[in-house]
Structures are given as structure tokens and as C-alpha cells.
Amino acid sequence: MYLLIVFLPLLGSGVAGFFGRFLGSEGSAIMTTTCVSFSSILSLIAFYEVALGASACYLKIAPWISSEMFDASWGFVFDSLTVVMLIVVTFISSLVHLYSISYMSEDPHSPRFMCYLSIFTFFMPMLVTGDNFLQLFLGWEGVGLASYLLIHFWFTRLQADKAAIKAMLVNRVGDFGLALGILGCFTLFQTVDFSTIFACASAPRNSWISCNMRLNAITLICILLLIGAVGKSAQIGLHTWLPDAMEGPTPVSALIHAATMVTAGVFMIARCSPLFEYSPTALIVITFAGAMTSFLAATTGILQNDLKRVIAYSTCSQLGYMIFACGISNYSVSVFHLMNHAFFKALLFLSAGSVIHAMSDEQDMRKMGGLASSFPFTYAMMLMGSLSLIGFPFLTGFYSKDVILELAYTKYTISGNFAFWLGSVSVLFTSYYSFRLLFLTFLVPTNSFGRDILRCHDAPIPMAIPLILLALGSLFVGYLAKDMMIGLGTNFWANSLFVLPKNEILAESEFAAPTIIKLIPILFSTLGAFLAYNVNLVADQFQRAFQTSTFCNRLYSFFNKRWFFDQVLNDFLVRSFLRFGYEVSFEALDKGAIEILGPYGISYTFRRLAERISQLQSGFVYHYAFAMLLGLTLFVTFFCMWDSLSSWIDNRSSFIWIVSSFYNKKSSQQ
């Protein structure tokens, strides 16, 4: 049963990929959706047995690599962390598959799309169930490859090509850091198995590595692993690929942002909690990185006009919350927020897809407006998703995001206070752009063409069913799962997560945090909604004052251009590498040394040599006789010199033999 959870999506992908032309669009969609749905049902059974029954399952399938000290095998671990991730991945993926049946029905390449979607789903369970770093890395690279294929699905669009290449290249930076971290783990622990590494994590706390500076070994490994998480989970510095990934079909965006690729980094940090707990420096770096990411993405999202990009930046911001929750050693709350976030983020993306699908692929919110009367169901779904996103009381997002902020405050450290205040300000911006999206899309007077309004329609039944199920999750999952997963005294994560006793602050955040600290997120959410209402729906004079202010214009330009991250990376890194590639790789090597030492140089040398030799053919006999005499003289001279040298070598060998024999006789007499 456990193996079927992992390999059923692979079966569906293989059938759709190899036999899609015979099954057709409907047959491929039914096959892939059925396989992923059965995987989701089996994940629920595994959750009951493993998480609720408190009985982890470990499977060793077969040896994989065995080379002297390096030994890796195919193995799967099913603990509470794994089964929670499996439910999130398979349940969201099954709904996305069902949604895609209607959304992609008119696309001629629908079987290929369903094949890619299922292979994407397969690699994520492979990542979360692996019992060693090597298997995790296989799933890690697999989701990167599948995301490239899905973002690049409409390959005739230039922007889709550029976005897919950008996602692949930016993630290569993080993947390189992860690979170095795995290599460091093997160097330090002589294994890549999680169980062995985590059991020995406390032993090398005082091990040091000298590379022009003295570095703690565990800290270095954790920083390298963090680089991998920064790339995959779109944290500050390597976050630029995530908004551009919106060039793929909307179901792809929902799957990437809600359940698969971007959650891999958070999962990896939670899985490696026994390592990170013994590196306070790495935890501080994680906290600062997550807090800055949440603030950066929130401030960027308030000025985006693309419907999907606004939701994409909200994903980036929420990932920042998950990362800095890991930085303050609350991995359980981070994973809980990951699970809650999956429901309302998938709901937001699929609701946006319903609008885009009905509006003939229009994504600019400024060209919409007044759609609440035409899309009452979609409007209700997006309203519920937005309220859950901002942490509206008693909805799913409220039970995890507010807890993260309270924990950051009661950490009572500089990094904790930094994360709390930046996270709280990010709540204000999150509320602002969430309500701005609702106002510009559904409530302001319409800016669409009349023909578009007349022919638009609400979500059909196959697209509405996933929205209803996700809406129920966005309303009730947080309330139902809070006490089980992050309640005081729960042992839900006992077999998967590790926290040092000195870092346990959940009880303190529950009882010692001041009431005003608990109310700050709600107050900021209300303020953000009020500002969005006044700026976008009521007060035109505020917009005019904003446009005439020099400072506001510069601030607008700064946020609208994404803090100039793309420009800085292009000017200082991309162009430098392209220039280096042209001047060194192309001109100096390809067209220089390789050509000279390679085919061009060899052919030129032999051609010139042949021309020189051909000039010796003068036609005079005495020239040939002189050449023969010269050659014979050189031949005889060489052999005479060789005979003299060889005789000298032979005489020296004889002398050594005589002396050694005399020495042996003398030794025997003594």
C-alpha cells in the first residue's frame, strides 16, 4: 500500500505519455486523475496508521549504490511528517487534475499536460518519503525538471521559454548548495542515511573545518542545505524565478505554489531539524532570511497588476513565514502552516484560473472589474481564500500564521523580534493586496469590453467541485488539526521532528505573550483592508496626491520594479557571465586554442608541412644523392652513439654486481 502511494502517479504519467495518442484527451485525463485520486485515498489510510496510530513504517527495497565506504539503498520512511506531506501533495494534486480536465479540454496537447502533471506529482512523494539524502536529491531534481516542463508547456510563447529557463538556472544555484551540503554530511558522518546522521548529529558539534577560516562543520553543512532551500522555496536572493513561473497554465501554478515544488525547501529543513538544532548560527540566518523574504514579497505584491503574480508574491511571502518559523525552532508550526497554506493558496489560484478561463486568458486586473455579478460562485471562493490568507479569525490561516508571529515574539532574541515586526508589517501588506485583488477584479466598475462580459461564465461543474473542497479546507482544516498538530503536550511529531528542550517556547507563547501582541496581526489585517478599500474603491484624491508626490513616485518605482533585484542580477551577474562566456569560452577557447590545437590547427600544420616537403622535389639527381648520404650518416651516427651508451650502462651494471657480491660474502663471513 505504501509503495502504491508513491508509484501510482508514475503509472498514470507513463500511460498518458506513451499511450496518450491512442487514449485521447479524455482517456489520458481519466487515467491520470484516477491514479492520483487512489494515491490520495491511500495517503489518508497511511495517515491514520502512521500519524494517528503512532507507528512509523520503514521500508528497505533494494541496494542502489555500493562503493567502498559509500552505501546507499532504495528505502522509504513513513512517519508523521511524511504522511502529512503526502496528504497535502496527493489531495491537492488530485483536485488540480480534476480541475484540469475542464480547464485544458480545448488544448490539443492535453495528454502531454496530464503526463507532466502526474510526473510532477510522482517526484514530490519520492522526495518526501526518501530515507536518505540521495533519494531526497533525486526527488528534488525531479520536481525541478517537471516544473521546467510545465512552465514551458506552451513552448511557442517566448515568455514561457524565458521563464522556464530562468526557473531552471536559478534553482541550479540552490541545487549546487544542496549537493555540497550532502557531500559535507557524507564527509562528516560517512553515510547519507537520515537515521544514522540524525542519531550522530550531536557528536561532531565541536568539529571544525579550516578553509582560509575556521568554520564549524555542522554550521557549514546547515548553511549549504539552507542555500538549497532558498533556491527551491524562493527566498530572498533566489526568489526571482517564482513570479515568472506564472507563464505556465494556471493549474500548474496552483500545484507548484500550493503543494509541490516551493514546499520542498521547507520540508527539507524540517526533515533535517536534528542537524539545524545543533547550529544556532544557521537558525539565526534562517530567521533573518525568512523574515526579509516575507516583507520583500509583501511590499512587491501590493503594486502588481497581473492577477496570478499577486497570488505568486503572496506565496513567496507565506514561504518566508514558514522559513523563519523553522529558524525559531518551531518546525511543527511551520509544517502546519504549510498544510493550511496549501488549501487556501490552491483555492486562490484555481479561482483565478476560473476568471482567466472565462475572460479569454486576460490576466490584467485593470482590464476587469465588476465581475461579482457574473462570477458569484468564483467571487465567493476567492473571498474565502483571501480571508484565510490574511488570517481572518477562526479560518484556517488564522490558526497557524498568528501562532508563528507569537512564537517569534516570545523567542526574546534580536532575530525573533526582527521576524515578529517584519512579519507583522507583512500582514498589513498581505491584507492590502488581497483586498485590492478582490476590489479590482470583482467590485470596481468594469473596464472590460462588453462582448467579454456578455460571453463570460462562472466555473463549470468539473472546475467547481475542486473549488468547493478547497474552500472547505480553507475554512475548517486549521481548526480541526490545530490541537492535534501544535497543541500543548502533543506527541504528533515525536517520530519525525526534533527540538532541543531549550528551544521549546510553545507554552510560553500561549500563556506569556501580552494580549496586544496577539492582537497586532488582526489589527494590521483590518488596517490593510481599510487602506485597500479607500485607495482602490473610494478616495480618488488619495491616488492623485500619490501621483504628484516625488517620494511616492520613487517608492512606487522601487516596489513595482521588485526592489530592482532583476536589474541588479542582470547587470552584475548575468551580463558578466555572458561577457565571460563570449570572450573566454567562445573567442579564446572555441575559436582560439581549441581550433588551433584541434581540427583547424592540425589540418593547417600538415598542409604547410606538405607544402614544405613538396619543395624538396627539385628534379635534380645530386640533390637526392645528397639527401640519401645525409640520412645514412645520421643513421650510422645514432647507432654508434647508442652502442657506446649501452656498453657504458652494461659496464656500470657489472661493477655494481661485483661490489654487491663482495659485500654479501663479507657479511656471511661475519
From Swiss-Prot:
Annotated transmembrane regions: 3-23, 36-56, 76-96, 113-133, 136-156, 218-238, 250-270, 283-303, 319-339, 340-360, 375-395, 418-438, 461-481, 619-639
GO CC terms, sorted: mitochondrial inner membrane; plastid
Pfam families to which the protein is assigned, alphabetical: NADH5_C, Proton_antipo_M, Proton_antipo_N
Any GO MF annotation of the entry: NADH dehydrogenase (ubiquinone) activity
One biological process term in Gene Ontology: ATP synthesis coupled electron transport
EC code: 7.1.1.2
Localization annotation: Mitochondrion inner membrane
Protein's membrane topology: Multi-pass membrane protein
Reactions that this protein is recorded to catalyse: a ubiquinone + NADH + 5 H(+)(in) = a ubiquinol + NAD(+) + 4 H(+)(out)
Domain of life assignment: Eukaryota
UniProt KW keywords: Electron transport, Membrane, Mitochondrion, Mitochondrion inner membrane, NAD, Respiratory chain, Translocase, Transmembrane, Transmembrane helix, Transport, Ubiquinone
UniProt KW Electron transport keyword: yes
Principal localisation: mitochondrion
Miscellaneous note of the record: Exons a and b and d and e are cis-spliced, while trans-splicing reactions are required to link exons b and c and c and d.
Its job: Core subunit of the mitochondrial membrane respiratory chain NADH dehydrogenase (Complex I) that is believed to belong to the minimal assembly required for catalysis. Complex I functions in the transfer of electrons from NADH to the respiratory chain. The immediate electron acceptor for the enzyme is believed to be ubiquinone.
Subunit and interaction comment: Complex I is composed of about 30 different subunits.
Family stated for the protein in its record: Belongs to the complex I subunit 5 family.
Protein name as annotated: NADH-ubiquinone oxidoreductase chain 5
The organism of origin for this protein: Oenothera berteroana (Bertero's evening primrose)
Gene name for this UniProt entry: ND5
